[in-house]
């Protein structure tokens, strides 16, 4: 497996540019070696031969995350339509890594289900761990964002008060295709 940068409809492999010991996007995030500004990115790309999108096979953005924490009922209209009461705290459930599927792979409808729903979500990828992180420092832990199809197997989701049973069938969580680096987008805001 490798990872790279998507720019001008080409993919540039960064795996070897970042040096030995960095063989995945997860490791690049852990070792904090991703380019965090356009100048640094251009320097990396000057030494890399690009691939076309047709040349590559995708994996989920982070195929082996440590945790996948999801926020349920994350907008008011959905909470109202499901007739759930207001809560002071968010509804949190987990997904397991083996429930993920990559870009261009098919989501698989479980044969035991009659009710499968698409749920387009924003994945927020945390790059720095920690404990007791203040609200003012929370944004600094984010490495980037991606698309996530949080497919719900509704009939199983409703078997209990927990969402987890309906969210973890194999190949039901489309993750990707790309990670958008937070600081490349928001650096101008933070530098003001």
Placement of each model-derived feature along the sequence:
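Glycine-enriched loop-and-adjacent helix/strand subsegments that border the catalytic/binding cleft
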Residues: 65-192
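N-terminal non-catalytic cap/leader segment that marks the start of a structured domain
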Residues: 1-90
